UniProtKB/Swiss-Prot annotation:
Classification of source organism: Bacteria, Pseudomonadati, Pseudomonadota, Gammaproteobacteria, Enterobacterales
GO cellular-component term (any): cytoplasm
Species of origin: Salmonella paratyphi A (strain AKU_12601)
Name of the protein this chain belongs to: NADPH-dependent 7-cyano-7-deazaguanine reductase
Enzyme class: oxidoreductase
Transmembrane stretches, start-end: none
NCBIfam families tied to this protein: QueF
């Protein structure tokens, strides 16, 4: 359970409540969640963040009417900057996108600009939006995370409660290594509804070698943990940086789709360019 799970800032969210679906444009449906909710307990403030990054969203269920009333469909790519005051709550994002369904827009660019303007206002930060026609995406191969997968270990696990204990004394030797580790066993739960969130995670670092068994046990300990995707990624970054003290660190997670949206946050303190291809479970 997160320390801020019952925070008053979450009281007004539609998440976890019965809601009506609207099919005419309504920007009021968008809701933000302050990033400070999870950053404050981690000792992170806007002027001392140890990372840069973004939350990458893929919008698979985006449709509207053109000026003649003919339905249009697109796949959207949204990048929400890590410096924004708020993250975007995903159910409200879905409801907001549904409100485009019976709304007429003159051009695709008008749709893109509308999305960008509204998301920036809700997040109180920088947002970029791209729209793709379906034929631009057809035939794209399923991507994979580059790196060594740490999942196939012959170990017994019986603790699924979140703890950073596994990261204590998780590095060994004085030699500096540079490696990329991958796990597909990341599972946490929605902060509000406690529905499961499934993800794959890529951890790229340079520093003293991290024990792979301890790292995997740490990741598995998220299994009963309740936080949003973005918050989990920042927690993982902060914990590894604190306990393992790598010189450079990049964390990138790609989560499975829900409600026509997938969320793929990344955080890094070095040069890092996230690959945006969908993984096998996306």
């Amino acid at each position: 359970m997160s320390s801020y799970e019952n925070h008053q800032a979450l009281d007004g969210l539609t998440l976890g409540k019965s809601t009506d679906y609207r099919d005419n444009y309504d920007v009021s449906l968008l809701q933000g969640v302050p990033r400070s909710l999870n950053r404050d307990p981690l000792g992170l403030t806007a002027d001392n963040l140890p990372f840069h990054g973004a939350d990458i969203w893929t919008l698979y269920e985006l449709s509207w009417l053109n000026s003649q009333g003919l339905p249009q469909v697109a796949v959207g790519h949204v990048e929400l900057d890590y410096t924004s005051v708020n993250l975007i709550e995903s159910k409200s994002f879905k409801l907001y996108l549904n409100s485009f369904n019976q709304t007429r827009f003159d051009t695709w660019e008008t749709v893109r600009q509308t999305l960008e303007r509204d998301l920036r206002a809700c997040a109180q930060g920088n947002v970029s939006v791209r729209l793709h026609r379906l034929d631009e995406l057809e035939g794209q191969p399923v991507a994979h995370f580059h790196g060594a997968c740490i999942d196939d270990q012959d170990i017994s696990i019986d603790n699924y409660q979140f703890t950073t204990d596994y990261l204590q004394h998780a590095v060994s030797g004085e030699k500096q290594v540079e490696e990329t580790l991958v796990s597909h066993l990341l599972k946490s739960n929605c902060l509000i509804t406690h529905q499961p969130d499934w993800g794959s995670i890529q951890i790229q670092y340079r520093g003293r070698k991290i024990d792979r068994e301890k790292l995997l046990r740490y990741l598995v300990s998220f299994r009963h943990h309740n936080e949003f995707h973005e918050q989990c990624v920042e927690r993982i970054f902060n914990d590894i940086l604190r306990f393992c003290q790598p010189e450079t660190l990049s964390i990138y997670a790609r989560y499975t789709r829900r409600g026509g949206l997938d969320i793929n946050p990344w955080r890094s303190n070095t040069d890092f360019v996230p690959a945006t291809g969908r993984l096998a479970r996306q």
